[in-house]
Amino acid sequence: MANAAAQRRQLVPFAALSATYFAHIGFFNPYLPLWLKELGLPIVVISLLTSVQSFTRVFAPYAWGALSDHTGERVRLLRLSAAIALVASLGLWWDGGAWWIGLVLLVLFTHTSSMMSLTEAAMAHLVAGDWGRYGRVRLWGSAGFMLTVFAAGAWFEGHGMRDFPAWTAVTLGGVLLCTWWLPDVREKHAHERAVKEPIAPVLREPAVRWFFASLFFHVMAHFAIYGFLSLYLDALGYSKAMIGTLWAVSVLVEIAWFFAQGRLIGRLRMTQWLVVGGAAAVLRMALTAGLGGWLAAMFIAQALHALTFASHHTACIAMLTQHFPGRLRGRGQALFTVIGYGLGGVLGVL
C-alpha cells in the first residue's frame, strides 16, 4: 500500500510535465504560421518552415530513444533536451530571415519532438499496467493544450503576434522546470544489457508489424483532419467561434475519456480497443466528409475523438509496453512517434 502511494506521488511530476509540454504545443503549433505570416514571409516559405517539425519526427525520436536505451538516463536526457530547446527558442527574437528561423526551428524541434516518447518510457514502470492511473496523468496534457489554445488566442487577438517568442520561452521554461521535478531514476547497467537486446527480432514478429502498419494509417488519416479541418469548416460557412467550439469538443471528450478510462479500458483487450478506434475513425471521417454541413453530425464526429485518439493512444502504449519491455522501451516508444507522427504525419498533410 505504501509503495503504491509512493508511486502515485512520483507520477505527479509526470502529470505536470505532460501539462506544460502540451501547453507549449497548444499555442506553438496553431499560432506559428500566423507569426510567420506577420513577419511578412510568403505562404510557400511558411509551409516549408512549419513542416520542419514533421521532418524532425522522422529521425529525432529514434535517435533519442536509442540513446536512452543505451544509457538508461531517460530523465537526464529529458532535462538536456528541454534545456537546449529553451536556449534555441531565444533565437526567435533575432530577425535573421527565413533561413535563420528554419535553423532555430530545426534545433528546437529536434529536441522537443522526442520528449513525450522519452517521458512515456521513463514513467512506464510507475504505471505498471494501471491504465486508469495512466489516464489521470495523460489528461493533464489535454487540459494544458486546451488552456493555451484559448489563452494564447485571446492574448494574440488583443496584443498581436509580437509576443510569440516570449510565449515560446515561457512555456519551454515551464517544461524545463518540470523535468527537474521528475524522480531521478536510472536503469542500472544499461550499456551492458542494451547490447544483448537487439530490436530486430521484435520487429519481425507479425503482431508488431501489423500494429505499426495500423498505427501509420490511423495517424495519417487523423493528420488530414488536424491539418485541414478548420479550412474545410470555414469553406462550408461555419463561423470562427463554431470552428473553435468543434475543436474544443474533441479535447473535452479526450479529457473525459482519460479521466474515466480506468473503469472502461478493462472491458476489452487492447487489441480490441485498436479495432474499436479504427472503426470509430472510419465513421468519423465519413461523417466529416459526407455530412460536414450538418452541425449535429460534426459534433458527433468530433466526439468520436475519445475513441479515435484517446482510447487508441492508451491501447498503443499498452502494446508498446508488452512488446518492448525493459531496455527496448525507449526505441519502441520512439518507433511509435516516428512511424505514426513522423511518416504518417508528413503524408497525412500532403
Say what each PLM segment does.
Residues 163-180:
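Symmetry-related core transmembrane helices of the 12-TM Major Facilitator Superfamily/SLC fold
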Residues 1-8, 182-215, 235:
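Juxtamembrane intracellular "pre-TM" segments in multi-pass secondary transporters
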Residues 19, 88-89, 98-116, 122, ...:
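Hydrophobic core of transmembrane alpha-helices in multi-pass small-molecule transporters
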Residues 59-73, 156-157, 256-270:
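Helix-to-loop junctions at the C-terminal end of transmembrane segments
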